[in-house]
Amino acid sequence: MAGKRDKIRLISSADTGHFYTTDKNKKNTPGKLEFKKYDPRVRRHVIYKEGKIK
């Protein structure tokens, strides 16, 4: 049986192609995650939104 955590990718909203990978508990957080994190390609903090790992 599979675990309760899904691997996800946090994709930069600055359209630089930069992303972070993490996992989330799909039972406790059913919605899409959104974080403000550092994007080294534009050298500033931007919003990262959840996307699937292909």
UniProtKB/Swiss-Prot annotation:
Q: Which GO terms describe its cellular component?
A: cytosolic large ribosomal subunit
The transmembrane residues are none
Q: Which GO terms describe its biological process?
A: translation
Q: Which domain of life is it from?
A: Bacteria
Q: Which InterPro entries match?
A: Ribosomal_bL33 (IPR001705), Ribosomal_bL33_CS (IPR018264), Ribosomal_bL33_sf (IPR038584), Ribosomal_zn-bd (IPR011332)
Q: Which UniProt keywords apply?
A: Ribonucleoprotein, Ribosomal protein
Q: Which Pfam family is an annotated match for this chain, by its short name?
A: Ribosomal_L33
List, alphabetically, the PROSITE patterns matched: RIBOSOMAL_L33
Q: GO MF terms on file?
A: structural constituent of ribosome
Q: Which family does it belong to?
A: Belongs to the bacterial ribosomal protein bL33 family.
- The entry's protein name is Large ribosomal subunit protein bL33
